[in-house]
């Protein structure tokens, strides 16, 4: 089974394998997906910069991929990782640290 990139970018939900905590949401194009499979580290496509980026490449806060899952429509990805350091660029453990209710 392979993701369907025919409509463009796919959302990728990144989850810490041990705690099952949602760490971040990013987007993958086909190249980012293939690089993720090959390197076992997360690669994403930046919509603002219009380029690939490797999570932790500059900060050292890398994500070691443990498993990937596709949804039933093959247009969304869940990535289970072992996170090194904080996942958020703000220094927070997760990008989802603002509680609303």
Swiss-Prot record:
Give the GO cellular component terms, alphabetically.
cytoplasm
Annotated Mg(2+) binding lies at: 71, 73, 75
* Required cofactor names: Mg(2+); Zn(2+)
Note on how the cofactor is bound: Binds 1 Mg(2+) ion per subunit. Binds 1 zinc ion per subunit.
Question: Which keywords belong to this entry?
Answer: Amino-acid biosynthesis, Cytoplasm, Histidine biosynthesis, Hydrolase, Magnesium, Metal-binding, Zinc
Q: Which SUPFAM superfamilies match?
A: HisI-like
Reaction(s) the record says it catalyses: 1-(5-phospho-beta-D-ribosyl)-5'-AMP + H2O = 1-(5-phospho-beta-D-ribosyl)-5-[(5-phospho-beta-D-ribosylamino)methylideneamino]imidazole-4-carboxamide
* Gene Ontology molecular-function annotations: magnesium ion binding; phosphoribosyl-AMP cyclohydrolase activity; zinc ion binding
Protein location? Cytoplasm
Q: Look at the named UniProt entry and state the broad enzyme category this protein falls under.
A: hydrolase
* Recorded metabolic or biological pathway in which this protein acts: Amino-acid biosynthesis; L-histidine biosynthesis; L-histidine from 5-phospho-alpha-D-ribose 1-diphosphate: step 3/9
Q: Does the keyword Kinase apply?
A: no
The protein's superkingdom reads Bacteria
Please provide an example of a Pfam family that matches this protein in its UniProt record. Answer: PRA-CH
What Enzyme Commission number(s) appear in the record?
3.5.4.19
Residues annotated as binding Zn(2+): 72, 88, 95
Biological process annotations from GO: L-histidine biosynthetic process
* Binding partners and assembly: Homodimer.
Q: Which family does it belong to?
A: Belongs to the PRA-CH family.
Functional note: Catalyzes the hydrolysis of the adenine ring of phosphoribosyl-AMP.
Question: Which HAMAP family has this protein been placed in?
Answer: HisI
Q: Give the protein's recorded name.
A: Phosphoribosyl-AMP cyclohydrolase
